[in-house]
Amino acid sequence: ESRLTDVLVDNGFVQVATPTIMSRGLLARMSIDANHPLSSQVFWLDDKTCLRPMLAPHLYYVLKDLLRLWEKPVRIFEVGSCFRKESSGARHSTEFTMLNLVEMGLELESRESRLNELAALIVEAAGIDEHELQTEESTIYGQTIDIVAGEGRVELGSAAMGPHPLDQPWRIAEPWVGIGFGLERLLMVAEGSESLGRVGRSLAYLNGVPLNI
């Protein structure tokens, strides 16, 4: 995590820290209402708040003000825990760490090349030799560009570009690129592990070594 943070700061990004508790209203701005497929995966604390299932809504909230206060392009990132009632399996966890980076206010025609640069920057800093970009359908963004690597082509992160319809509730109209990486998945592929449990937050493992030996 510290290596990725240092690389982003060295490349002009500013780290932000937003609350772990998120309001229902902010999720609704991302089109996640009671009928959305992701809603059933959310850990609701009460009728109005939940443990954040993603970082994006809070980053939108911060960006709408930074676009007014800072010169463009605005470059920020956040590293933080997210929570979802994910399907079981070696590559899923109910608590996981996301790294989201956003560059907003860049030239429209440079978005794709910049996205490639930023994906390579993080993947290489994580110690992963090669990766691919694949276009995938998304229940939130409509379409994303997934970064995959390793045996079995593990999804390391998902990227999107704007302007995007989800920008409208925030009155944002700037071109942007953003990527959300799963830190545990980056570590899993970098270390050649087959299980997220060995590299994530755990009571059973320390630095990938089982404690019940």
Residue ranges and their predicted role:
Residues 44-213:
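A translation/RNA-centric and nucleic-acid-associated enzymatic feature enriched
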Residues 1-39:
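TRNA-binding/sensing appendages of the translation machinery
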